[in-house]
Each structure stands twice: as structure tokens, then as C-alpha cells.
């Protein structure tokens, strides 16, 4: 496995709608393995292919190390890591929850986002098997966050123009400080 370079805002690839994958083959599995390694290396819980400069509809997730205690949901209900190709999300109920989210493509930013609390996601798994998963709470939030990346939507897109500009300016200063070292 390899650690891939992370793409950060405002890179234009993050604003493109990613292309569907025809079939999950060995090269797609290798990409997913590399994405997972990259996610772990950067202490993330989810990663979408556009975040590593690949415009394909692929996400990986692993919330197993996140301490989740909400609505009697435990992480042990899900088998991690999750590999999702061409995920399609459908809300199961209209109930939403608002919480702060971080993003590997927007380092050191935490942005409040309202998302569906309970979803159903249909996707091709690691072995090209069509799979349906019902998720709620933080897993539902993480899936929706990563699917946003596949649709060219970033966390800052949920902010007003003024707050979005401030967040991107902060990110620019962080990048400049890192570059100067």
C-alpha cells in the first residue's frame, strides 16, 4: 500500500463531480487500499477519491476508533473498514442533526453542518458486490460528508459567502506557513 498526496481546497478537482466506476477490479481495489492507508496516516475517518486527485466515485471509511455513544448506537454494529464504490444515499427519515465536522481537505477547520440522522446507502463493495447499508448517527454523517466530495461539495459550501471566504483565507495562511518551513 502507498500513502497518496492529499488535495486541499481550493484545488479545482474538489469541485468536480466524480465519474462512476464501471466495475471493482484489482486496480480499483489497490486504489481503495491506498486511500485507506492515506486516511489512517492522516488520522481521518473517511476519504473520497477526489481528495487524492482521482475523480472517481469511491469512498473509504473507518469509524472503529471513534468513541460513539449516541442513541444506543455502537460502532460494533458495523464492520470496518467500509469501501463504497458509486454510493447512492437516500434519507430514511427527515430527522436531521447539526454537528461540527472536520475534513482532511480543509485542515484545522471545523464547520457546523446539518445532515440526515438516518440514511440508506447502496454501493458496490470491495468485491464488486451490490450492497445496501442502513446507517445512522455519526456513520450516516460521515457517509454523507464523503459523498458530498463525490458531488464536488465541500464543507465550506455550507457557509455564507463571508464565512466561506474567511475559512479559505485561514486555510491559505496555514498552507503558506507550512510552505515557509
Swiss-Prot record:
Q: Which cofactor does it need?
A: Fe(2+)
Report any Pfam family annotated for this entry.
Answer: Pep_deformylase
The protein's matches in Gene3D superfamilies, at most eight in alphabetical order, are given as: Peptide deformylase (3.90.45.10)
What keywords tag this UniProt record?
Hydrolase, Iron, Metal-binding, Protein biosynthesis
InterPro entries on file: Peptide_deformylase (IPR023635), Peptide_deformylase_sf (IPR036821)
What reactions does this protein catalyze?
N-terminal N-formyl-L-methionyl-[peptide] + H2O = N-terminal L-methionyl-[peptide] + formate
Instruction: State which Enzyme Commission number(s) the record gives.
Output: 3.5.1.88
Physiological role:
Removes the formyl group from the N-terminal Met of newly synthesized proteins. Requires at least a dipeptide for an efficient rate of reaction. N-terminal L-methionine is a prerequisite for activity but the enzyme has broad specificity at other positions.
NCBIfam families this protein is in?
A: pept_deformyl, PRK00150.1-3
The record's listing under PANTHER family reads: PEPTIDE DEFORMYLASE (PTHR10458:SF22)
Name-wise, this protein is Peptide deformylase
Q: Which gene is the coding source of this polypeptide chain?
A: def
Amino acid at each position: 500500500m502507498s500513502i497518496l498526496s492529499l488535495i486541499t481546497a481550493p484545488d479545482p478537482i474538489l469541485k468536480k463531480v466524480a465519474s462512476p466506476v464501471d466495475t471493482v477490479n484489482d486496480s480499483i481495489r489497490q486504489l481503495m487500499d491506498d486511500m485507506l492507508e492515506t486516511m489512517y496516516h492522516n488520522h481521518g475517518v473517511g476519504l473520497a477519491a477526489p481528495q487524492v486527485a482521482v475523480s472517481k466515485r469511491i469512498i473509504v471509511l473507518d469509524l472503529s476508533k471513534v468513541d460513539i455513544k449516541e442513541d444506543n448506537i455502537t460502532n460494533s454494529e458495523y464492520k470496518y473498514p467500509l469501501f463504497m464504490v458509486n454510493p447512492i444515499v437516500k434519507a430514511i427519515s427527515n430527522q436531521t442533526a447539526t454537528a461540527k465536522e472536520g475534513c482532511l481537505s480543509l485542515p484545522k477547520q471545523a464547520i457546523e453542518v446539518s445532515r440526515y440522522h438516518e440514511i440508506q446507502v447502496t454501493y458496490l463493495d470491495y468485491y464488486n458486490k451490490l450492497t445496501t447499508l442502513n446507517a445512522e448517527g455519526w456513520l450516516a454523517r460521515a457517509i454523507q460528508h464523503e459523498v458530498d466530495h463525490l458531488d464536488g461539495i465541500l464543507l465550506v459550501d455550507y457557509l455564507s459567502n463571508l464565512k466561506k471566504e474567511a475559512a479559505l483565507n485561514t486555510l491559505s495562511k496555514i498552507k503558506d506557513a507550512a510552505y515557509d518551513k
